[in-house]
From Swiss-Prot:
Compartments in which it is found: Cytoplasm
A Pfam short name: Put_DNA-bind_N
Record function comment: Modulates transcription in response to changes in cellular NADH/NAD(+) redox state.
Keyword annotations: Cytoplasm, DNA-binding, NAD, Repressor, Transcription, Transcription regulation
A Gene Ontology biological process term: response to redox state
Major place of residence: cytoplasm
Gene Ontology cellular-component annotations: cytoplasm
Residues that coordinate or bind NAD(+): G92, V93, G94, H95, L96, G97
SUPFAM superfamilies attached to this UniProt entry: NAD(P)-binding Rossmann-fold domains, Winged helix' DNA-binding domain
GO molecular function, one term: DNA binding
Gene3D superfamilies: NAD(P)-binding Rossmann-like Domain, Winged helix-like DNA-binding domain superfamily/Winged helix DNA-binding domain
Domain of life according to the entry: Bacteria
Protein name in the entry: Redox-sensing transcriptional repressor Rex
Length: 218
């Protein structure tokens, strides 16, 4: 985010890619304008929250008219840096890592896994879905060559912190952590933790204690 752009709440920032994906779909279908109520129904975020999120960026729409789809598309493409390619490294090419390589964020035009790393000699030197797999000992050199500053971590939890330490040392600025380990990194490095077992347990708890959901979607 540049100095000229507003600093928005983190919760709002996490919803922006969701809005952008739906707006892309609207644009592809030929729709020219959309109301906050229509957006709310599609993305399962209440209208008041959508209007508040959009208000951080100024007047994106007009009362009684809604939002111009083309304008929103252009605005969010610029805000989310969709014209700037982000190269991503995958560290840990096990079952989950292999799934990421095969998927490779096909719906995201600006995000691609360009290299994978693993300690398994049977995987090193192979190519999976067009992504070359290298030994973890080669991370520093290859990451610098490819100007990578984002990594997905899917290694065994016992190795997560030491691998994260290496990633930080190699200049990584963002880590998407799929291991159960809670990583310690400098303030200059952003980590998002995604623990699938915790998410599943949380889902089951909410099913049991909040069965009607009341319009709340996580």
């Amino acid at each position: 985010m540049s100095q000229n752009e507003p600093k928005i709440p983190q919760a709002t920032a996490k919803r922006l890619p969701l809005y952008y994906r739906f707006i892309q779909s609207l644009h592809a279908s030929g729709k020219q304008r959309v109301s906050s109520a229509e957006l709310s129904e599609a993305v399962k975020v209440d209208s008041a929250t959508i209007r508040r999120d959009f208000s951080y960026f100024g007047a994106l729409g007009k009362k009684g008219y809604g939002y111009n789809v083309q304008y929103l598309l252009d605005f969010f493409r610029k805000t989310l840096n969709q014209d700037e390619i982000t190269n991503v490294a995958l560290v840990g090419v096990g079952h989950l890592g292999t799934a990421f390589v095969n998927y490779n964020f096909l719906k995201n035009n600006n995000t691609h896994i360009v290299v994978g790393f693993d300690a398994d000699e049977t995987k090193v030197g192979t190519t999976m879905s067009g992504v070359p797999i290298h030994h973890v000992d080669e991370m520093e050199q290859i990451m610098k060559q490819n100007k990578i500053d984002v990594a997905i971590l899917t290694v065994p939890s016992a190795y997560a912190q030491s691998v994260a330490d290496d990633l930080v040392r190699f200049g990584i600025k963002g880590i998407l952590n799929f291991t159960p380990a809670r990583l310690t990194v400098p303030d200059t490095v952003r980590v998002h933790h995604i623990d699938l077992s915790i998410e599943l347990q949380s889902l089951i708890y909410f099913m049991q204690h909040y069965p009607t959901a009341e319009g709340v979607h996580q």
